[in-house]
C-alpha cells in the first residue's frame, strides 16, 4: 500500500513538475561530489575535477541501468545554459581573485601565451586534422568545421595544475598558468566566433586578414566594455556609499553589475568571457575598496563559491555525458576509428602546445634579460606550463556542442562522431593527465625548491630604478630642461625594461587620477595584491 502511494505521488509530481525530480537528483549528486572531494583532499592522484567526472560517470551508469539503457542523463545539455549561467561566475571570479601585481608584471608573457599561442595551436590542429582525418576514413567535415576544431581543442583547462601549485611558493609559475588559462579560454571563444563569420563560399586572399580583424575588434571592444562596467560600478559604489544603510545592497550591486557586463557583451555579439574577466579585475581593484569590510569579505567568498559550484556542475555533466549511447550509436565511426580520431586529436594537442610554449618562453627570457628580476622561465617551468595546458575541459565541450549539435541533439553521423570524440579527449586528458599532474609537479618542483622559488619571487627588483610613485609624469613647476631629461631617461628605461616601466607609470597615473575618482586606498596603504 505504501509503495503504491509513493509511486502515485512520484508520478503525479513528475507529471506536474517535470524538472523537479532531475534537478533534485542532480543537486543531491552535487552535494555528494563535494563531500567525496573533501574526503579525497589529501589524495596524491585525485583532484576535484577528476572526482566530479568519476561521480558523474557513476551516476550516469546508475541512471542507465534504471532507465534500461535509454538514457544516462539527468539533465539535457544546452550550450546556452553553459554560456549564460555557468561560465560567467567562473570567469568573473578568476578576474576578481587574480593577484593583480604578478598578473600585470607578467602581462606580456601571459598575452603571448594566451593569444599568439592559441593562433599557433589552432593552425596546427586545424591543418593536422584536415590532413589526417581522411586517411583514417573520417570524412564529411567542412572547412569551417576544421577551423572550429582547431579553436575547440586550443581551449585549455588549467584547474588541475592550479589546485597543486601554490601562488605564494611559485608566484611566477602560478601567475603564468593562471593568467594564460583565462586569456586562452577567452581567445578561443573569440576566435571560434570569428570563424563562424567567415564566408567560405567566397574565400579570397583577404580572408585571413578578415578573421584577424574580426578577432581584434571582438577582443578590444569586449575588453573596453568590461573596463567600462567595472569603472561605472566602482564610481556608483564610491559616490552613493550603499553601506551606510545596507551592506546587502552594495553586495547585490556588485553581483548584478558583474552579470550585466556579461549579458551586455552577448547582446552586442562580443566576447562575454573577456568582458566579465576585466570587469572582475576592475571591481577588485576599485569597487571592493568602496564597500564595507564585511561586504568585501563576503563578496570574495560568494564569488568563489558560485565559481566552485559551476565548475563542479560542468564536470559532473561531462561524466554523465560519456555514457550517452545515443551519440555513440549515431556516430559514423567504428570503435577503432573513434580511438584513431581521438588519438590524432590528442597528439595534435600535445604538438600544438609544445609549438608555442617552449619558443615563446625562450623569447620571453631573451626580452627580460636586462631586467635583473631573477624570474626567468626555467626549463622545468616550461614543462609544467606545457603540461598544465594539455587538459581540455568545459569550454571545449560547450564549443563542440555549439558547432556540431542543435540544443544538444544531433542526428548527423559525422557531427555525432565529433561530439563523442570531443568527450573522449576531454575525459582522457582530464583523467590521465590530471592523475599524473601531482607526481609530475612534485618531481620537477620538490618542496625545498618550491620554497626557494617563492623566496626569489618575493624579492624586490634590485636593478629597477627607484622613483617616487607619487610624482606626476610632468611637472609645470620644474624647468623645461628638467622635464626633458626626465622624459629622455624614461624613454631609455622603456627601451631596456618595457614591462617594468609601463607598470611604474601606470601606478603614477592610477594614484594621481583614477583612485580619487573610482576609489581604493593610496598605493602606500594598499596591501600587495
From Swiss-Prot:
Keywords: Antiport, Glycoprotein, Ion transport, Membrane, Potassium, Potassium transport, Sodium, Sodium transport, Transmembrane, Transmembrane helix, Transport, Vacuole. It is a multi-pass membrane protein. It is found in: Vacuole membrane. GO terms for biological process: potassium ion homeostasis; potassium ion transport; regulation of pH. Residues 41-45, 134-171, 236-250, 292-301, 364-380, 437-529 are vacuolar. InterPro entries: Cation/H_exchanger_CPA1, Cation/H_exchanger_TM, Na+/solute_symporter_sf, NaH_exchanger. Glycans are attached at residue 374. The keyword Signal does not apply. GO terms for cellular component: plasma membrane; vacuolar membrane. Residues 1-19, 67-73, 95-112, 193-214, 268-273, 323-342, 402-415 are cytoplasmic. GO terms for molecular function: sodium ion transmembrane transporter activity; sodium:proton antiporter activity. Pfam families: Na_H_Exchanger. Disulfide bonds: none annotated. The chain crosses the membrane at residues 20-40, 46-66, 113-133, 172-192, 215-235, 251-267, 274-291, 302-322, 343-363, 381-401, 416-436. Gene3D superfamilies: 1.20.1530.20. It catalyses: Na(+)(in) + H(+)(out) = Na(+)(out) + H(+)(in); K(+)(in) + H(+)(out) = K(+)(out) + H(+)(in). Expressed at very low levels in roots and shoots. Residues 74-94 dip into the membrane without crossing it. Belongs to the monovalent cation:proton antiporter 1 (CPA1) transporter (TC 2.A.36) family. May act in low affinity electroneutral exchange of protons for cations such as Na(+) or K(+) across membranes. May also exchange Li(+) and Cs(+) with a lower affinity. PANTHER family: SODIUM/HYDROGEN EXCHANGER (PTHR10110), SODIUM_HYDROGEN EXCHANGER 4 (PTHR10110:SF179). This is Sodium/hydrogen exchanger 4. It comes from Arabidopsis thaliana. The gene is NHX4.
Amino acid at each position: 500500500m505504501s509503495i503504491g502511494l509513493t509511486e502515485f505521488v512520484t508520478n503525479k509530481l513528475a507529471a506536474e513538475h517535470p524538472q523537479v525530480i532531475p534537478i533534485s537528483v542532480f543537486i543531491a549528486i552535487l552535494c555528494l561530489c563535494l563531500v567525496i572531494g573533501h574526503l579525497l583532499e589529501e589524495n596524491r592522484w585525485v583532484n576535484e575535477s577528476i572526482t566530479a567526472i568519476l561521480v558523474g560517470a557513476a551516476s550516469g551508469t546508475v541512471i542507465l541501468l534504471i532507465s534500461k539503457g535509454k538514457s544516462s542523463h539527468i539533465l539535457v545539455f544546452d550550450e546556452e545554459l553553459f554560456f549564460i549561467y555557468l561560465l560567467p561566475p567562473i570567469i568573473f571570479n578568476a578576474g576578481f581573485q587574480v593577484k593583480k601585481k604578478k598578473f600585470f608584471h607578467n602581462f606580456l608573457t601571459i598575452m603571448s601565451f594566451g593569444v599568439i599561442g592559441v593562433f599557433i595551436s589552432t593552425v596546427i590542429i586545424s591543418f593536422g586534422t584536415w590532413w589526417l582525418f581522411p586517411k583514417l576514413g573520417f570524412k564529411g567535415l567542412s572547412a569551417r568545421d576544421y577551423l572550429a576544431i582547431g579553436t575547440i581543442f586550443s581551449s585549455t583547462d588549467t584547474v588541475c595544475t592550479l589546485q597543486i601549485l601554490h601562488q605564494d611558493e611559485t608566484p611566477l609559475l602560478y601567475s603564468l598558468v593562471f593568467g594564460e588559462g583565462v586569456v586562452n579560454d577567452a581567445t578561443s571563444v573569440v576566435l571560434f566566433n570569428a570563424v563562424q563569420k567567415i564566408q567560405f563560399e567566397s574565400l579570397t586572399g583577404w580572408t585571413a586578414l578578415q578573421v584577424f580583424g574580426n578577432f581584434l575588434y571582438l577582443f578590444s571592444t569586449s575588453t573596453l566594455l568590461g573596463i567600462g562596467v567595472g569603472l561605472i560600478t566602482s564610481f556608483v559604489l564610491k559616490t552613493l556609499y550603499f553601506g551606510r544603510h545596507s551592506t546587502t545592497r552594495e553586495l547585490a550591486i556588485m553581483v548584478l553589475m558583474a552579470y550585466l557586463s556579461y549579458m551586455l557583451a552577448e547582446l552586442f555579439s562580443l566576447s562575454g568571457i573577456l568582458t566579465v574577466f576585466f570587469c572582475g579585475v576592475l571591481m577588485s581593484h576599485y569597487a571592493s575598496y568602496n564597500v564595507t569590510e564585511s561586504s568585501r569579505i563576503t563578496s570574495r567568498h560568494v564569488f568563489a563559491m558560485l565559481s566552485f559550484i559551476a565548475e563542479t556542475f560542468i564536470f559532473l555533466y561531462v561524466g554523465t555525458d560519456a555514457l550517452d549511447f545515443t551519440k555513440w550509436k549515431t556516430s559514423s565511426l567504428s570503435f577503432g576509428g573513434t580511438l584513431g580520431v581521438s588519438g590524432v586529436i590528442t597528439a595534435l594537442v600535445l604538438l600544438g602546445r609544445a609549438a608555442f610554449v617552449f619558443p615563446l618562453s625562450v623569447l620571453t627570457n631573451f626580452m627580460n634579460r636586462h631586467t635583473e628580476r631573477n624570474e626567468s622561465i626555467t626549463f622545468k617551468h616550461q614543462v609544467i606550463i606545457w603540461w598544465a595546458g594539455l587538459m581540455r575541459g568545459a569550454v571545449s565541450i560547450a564549443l563542440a556542442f555549439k558547432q556540431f549539435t542543435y540544443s544538444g541533439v544531433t542526428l548527423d553521423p559525422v557531427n555525432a562522431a565529433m561530439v563523442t570524440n570531443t568527450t573522449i579527449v576531454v575525459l582522457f586528458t582530464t583523467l590521465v593527465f590530471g592523475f599524473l599532474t601531482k607526481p609530475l609537479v612534485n618531481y620537477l618542483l620538490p618542496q625545498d625548491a618550491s620554497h626557494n622559488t617563492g623566496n626569489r619571487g618575493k624579492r624586490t627588483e634590485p636593478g629597477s630604478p627607484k622613483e617616487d610613485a607619487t610624482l606626476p609624469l610632468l611637472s609645470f613647476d620644474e624647468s623645461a630642461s628638467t622635464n626633458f631629461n626626465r622624459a629622455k631617461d624614461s624613454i631609455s628605461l622603456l627601451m631596456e625594461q618595457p614591462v617594468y616601466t609601463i607598470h611604474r607609470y601606470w601606478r603614477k597615473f592610477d594614484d594621481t587620477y583614477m583612485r580619487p575618482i573610482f576609489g581604493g586606498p593610496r598605493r602606500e596603504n594598499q596591501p600587495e595584491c
